[in-house]
Design a protein with these regions (language model features):
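Short alpha-helical basic/polar micro-motif
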Residues: 207, 372, 376, 552
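Histidine-centered active-site/metal-ligand motif
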Residues: 175-176, 191, 367, 427, ...
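Hydrophobic helix-and-loop "lid/oligomerization" segment in the mid-to-C-terminal part
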Residues: 19-25, 29-147, 167-168, 218-439, ...
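A residue-level signal for conserved active-site and pocket-lining positions in enzyme catalytic cores
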Residues: 44, 150, 298, 483, ...
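Mid-to-C-terminal polyanion-binding domains and interfaces
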Residues: 4, 9, 84, 88-91, ...
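N-terminal amphipathic/basic leader segments beginning at the initiator methionine
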Residues: 1-23
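Structural signal for conserved beta-strand scaffold positions within catalytic alpha/beta enzyme cores
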Residues: 18, 124, 172, 188-190, ...
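Conserved phosphate-handling catalytic cores of large alpha/beta enzymes
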Residues: 138-246, 412
């Protein structure tokens, strides 16, 4: 297949790939037979959705997609012990990770327990002092004062710390990759255990917790007792799923779609307060979960107090919610300032290493709370898997982020097994690691080799998939609303990207923090407003008035300002329009 619009190398060095003739034919038939907008039909066809599947895809229902919780190993013993502790009034502790998934998972349990008239102790370790996951001193202290400890979003590899919880039962609800053996405890419910053969590995921890609560409610119903309303808690599952970059496919897509509906009702004081502080005055989307609310919930665990996010998500008190939201917002501002310095240093260091399969950087004094975000930025900038490590004395603690098709979690897990890391683990798109300073070069060299075997760092122009060609006059709010029926969009479910051909630049200016605001004309009365985030110093800055005609590509969105809704393009790429 030739390059779409003959763009074999764009301003950002990419080759444009558009729909095939067969995809065009199928989309035409789907649009006609299912009475869909052609752009929506093409979006569905490009994602492998046939006409028979389209109705179910456009209206995903949990009752059709939610799996039986008991398909997960150890779910039965976990539900038995959890419900037993609740009904006997035993002392329960929740040990959670300090990120959004951990906080939302903890908030799910705390909310459900509160609706059942029970309370639980929340424990979230300090990122710097204790690190990720259960540790022996904390587990021993909790075991001395509790009958049951539920570890969420952590614990699968915590053999020693869980053994230290003598005197208390332990349940693990997790989704990180498991090892060859499991901790000795009541249950390890994890779709990514090595002995799991199901297709639920894409669930985040909050999704696993939700399934436990579904099973608990089912058992309560069998006993003639109504359980708490789980549908009202789907806002937490949606937030965790998007913020943890879990694939928005299958049941995850239904969980997020319904969770966004619940969130729009503003029934959870913490999320309502956070939305107000973030000036989010429209119905939330998956984008808002990942880039507006998620970072603020995460900020406490990154640079502040680890339990702030979970407390915000769990509280029923509007006054407490407001106070916590203000603290988290302040921490998020601090996080941005810290992140900017680390990012500049990491980008320069990685650039100096050249173009290998892995982009990595390490530095003394870097804040461990921001290395994950900086790794994500480095991955986006280089389109390669990235690792960023904060060094402190002889030890480095880092985060890894990957690109589609390259399993960073498996590679990190293998490095730990080979002794090149003190510890490490994660999932396909993200992982964490701890490494000795003197082993760092060897570890990164080995990781680079493992990732290269998966195709990381392949040379040549990168492909930019496009879902079709539109005219500026077609970019209306009703078209965007139609396309959004294929959402929510996110990991493994990207929003459709369209091209617009042969346009001139009518206006360009820099806005905000280095963003480009551009207006395009097509010479036939059509105009398209666009924004290119962070592009003021990049190749797209060549889009200047009077600089010629261009093909452009990006994602359409509705921009709401002072009650007025307009369409704008999130501009991702452009190329000179070659006249024939």
């Amino acid at each position: 297949m030739g390059a779409f619009l003959d763009v074999s190398e764009s301003l950002t060095g990419r080759r444009w790939i558009g729909p095939s003739l067969e995809e065009d034919r199928l989309a035409e038939a789907m649009a006609r037979d299912a009475r869909l907008d052609r752009a929506l039909a093409l979006t569905l066809v490009r994602r492998g959705i046939g006409i028979d599947q389209a109705p179910g895809f456009l209206d995903p229902r949990l009752r059709d997609l939610l799996p039986d919780p008991l398909t997960l190993r150890d779910m039965g013993p976990a539900a038995d012990r959890f419900l037993q502790a609740v009904q006997r009034g035993e002392r329960i502790a929740v040990f959670a990770d300090y990120d959004v998934d951990g906080g939302a998972s903890a908030a799910l349990l705390l909310t459900w327990l509160r609706r059942m008239g029970r309370n639980a102790t929340l424990y979230i370790p300090d990122r710097i002092e204790e690190g990720y996951g259960p540790n022996e001193p904390a587990m021993a202290r909790l075991a001395a004062a509790h009958d049951l400890i539920v570890c969420v979003d952590c614990g699968t590899l915590s053999h020693g710390p869980i053994a230290a919880a003598a005197g208390a039962d332990v349940i693990v609800l997790d989704h990180h990759m498991g090892g060859e053996t499991l901790p000795d405890c009541v249950a390890v419910v994890n779709p990514n255990r090595q002995d799991e053969s199901g297709d639920l590995g894409h669930l985040c921890a909050a999704g696993v917790v939700f399934l436990l609560l579904v099973e608990a409610n089912r058992r309560l119903k069998a006993q003639g007792q109504a359980g708490p309303d789980l549908m009202a808690m789907l806002d937490l599952v949606a937030l965790a799923t998007v913020a943890d970059v879990a694939p928005l496919t299958g049941v995850n897509r239904a969980l997020v779609r319904q969770g966004l509906v619940i969130m729009a009702k503003r029934q959870r004081p913490g999320l309502a307060a956070l939305a107000d502080i973030a000036a989010l005055n429209t119905a939330p989307s998956a984008y808002h979960l990942g880039y507006v609310l998620g970072p603020r919930v995460n900020a406490g665990g990154r640079v502040g107090q680890a339990d702030l996010g979970a407390r915000l998500l769990a509280t029923d008190d509007p006054h407490e919610a407001q106070a916590l939201a203000e603290r988290l917002n302040a921490h998020n501002i601090e996080r941005r300032e810290i992140e900017a310095g680390v990012q500049a240093a990491a980008m320069a260091q990685a650039e100096g290493r050249g173009d290998g399969p892995l982009a990595w950087a390490a530095g003394d004094g870097w804040h461990p709370g921001v290395v994950g975000i900086v790794a994500a930025r480095l991955k986006e900038a280089t389109q390669r898997p990235a690792v960023v490590i904060a060094l402190d004395g002889d030890i480095g603690k880092g985060s890894a982020r990957s690109v589609p098709g390259v399993d960073i979690g498996a590679a990190i897990h293998r490095l730990a097994g080979e002794g090149l890391l003190l510890r490490g683990g994660g999932h396909r798109m993200a992982a964490g690691l701890t490494v000795e300073r003197d082993r760092l070069p060897a570890a990164m060299e080995r990781l680079s080799d493992l990732l290269a075997r998966q195709g990381a760092g392949a040379t040549g122009p990168r492909d930019l998939p496009l879902d079709g060609l539109l005219m500026p006059k077609a970019a209306r709010t009703d078209l965007v609303e139609s396309i959004e029926k294929a959402g929510p969009f996110g990991a493994a479910a990207p929003s459709p990207r369209f091209a617009f051909s042969d346009l001139t630049v009518a206006m360009q200016r820099i806005v905000g923090n280095g963003h480009l605001k551009i207006a395009f004309n097509d010479g036939m009365g059509g105009r398209l407003d666009a924004i290119a985030f962070g592009a003021a110093e990049g190749p797209l800055a060549r889009l200047l008035p009077g600089s010629g005609r261009f093909h452009i590509a990006g994602r359409l969105e509705i921009n709401t300002w002072q009650g007025r809704r307009t369409v704008q393009l999130q501009l991702e790429d452009a190329a000179p329009a070659l006249r024939r």
